[in-house]
Each structure stands twice: as C-alpha cells, then as structure tokens.
C-alpha cells in the first residue's frame, strides 16, 4: 500500500499538487483498535518555532514502548520506526538532488548500530534522515535507497558509512507519554518552511541475504492521513 500510494502519485506528477493543497494544521487520525497502541497515530504535526523545526507524532498508547525483539544477528533483523515523509528534496539534507522521497524517521533496532562516526545507538530510539524509493522485492514496496557497490555519491557529514542513503544526525529526540518529538535547528534545514508532510509508523527489515535491497519497508502499521497524501503543511508556531 505504501509504495502504491506514494510512488504512484510521484509518477503521476501530483506531489506538487499536494504541496499546494496542504493545510497548516496537524494531521489528525481516528484511533484504530487493530493497530498496536504505541503505533496508532492520532496526530502528526511539524512546526517551526524560533530557530527550530519540531516534528511531533502522538499515538493512542505510550510512544516508544514497543521495540523489536533482538535476533542476535544483523541479517534479517527488524527496525521499528516513527516516520514523517516530506516534500523536501534530498539535496536539502546533504545528498544529491532528486534521489527519492525524503523522510525523517525515529528508529529502534537492537541488533546493529548506525550512528555517525562509529557511535553506538542500538539501545536507544534515535533519528535518521532516509531517502526512500520503490522496490518490488520489498514486502512493503519501498526501500531505503541503496548505494551500489563502487559508487561514491554525495553524502552528509553524519552519514554512518553504510551503503544506503541514510543520515544519522544527533537531533534532540524525546519520548513523553503519547508523543515522540524531534527538534532540528533551522540552520540545518532551510527548505522546511512551507513543506508538506505526513505521518507513518512502520516496521522495516534488513535483508536476510545482505544484498540489495538491504533495508526494506516490511510492514506499515498506520498512515496518519490514511492515503499518504502529505496533507500536512509546516506551520509557524508561537
């Protein structure tokens, strides 16, 4: 579903229409009992306040309370994520331009580290920028974009030296009750004003054979808008 909604719209050239039609208020969603409470999105919002952009998602349960079980190995391991797909261009987060769908993701994965500069982050929820693209080999239809062997594309300074278009910036990330929040300095995200967004909770999986696609969207828990139409518009807060 995720891939069909998002990549289909991109192929039709409708992302620009979504940007123009977006509204400057939170995306609100009705609770769904079939969705695990900690991933059942009820509100997603992105605002700019003073010198920061603040991404927030609220859920029906306690945000961050459910984590994937450790498998003891990298291949085939699971990742849980709170995700904000956006209309940002990949060039605005340090990669080459026009590489795919830019999303901010707060993730937990107990079987491996992908922090910048070789740091450890397998035991904490932490933020990433990811660039997504369609791949039919993935159960969810989308992958974090692979870097082919031998290629050396432009990457941001906090790229974790893995063969993916992924960044590991150390943005302040907090979980409090039903909310997860990421605060990003506007000086690092100049294109956020007027951008469009949505909210997603999802599970990802590392390829068991460790080849492309390396990291797939495996299971979409919930999409805030219901149709991934990026109806949110970044607003200026007080």
Task: Place the predicted regions along the sequence by residue.
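Acidic/polar low-complexity flexible segments
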Residues: 84-90, 193-238
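Short helix-loop boundary/capping segments
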Residues: 133-185
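Bacterial N-terminal signal peptides that target proteins for export
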Residues: 1-9
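Surface-exposed, glycine/proline- and aromatic-rich loop segments on solvent-exposed faces
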Residues: 35-133
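Cleavable N-terminal signal peptides
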Residues: 10-12, 22
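Solvent-exposed loop and beta-edge segments used for protein-protein assembly and interaction
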Residues: 47-51, 121-123, 174-178, 194-198
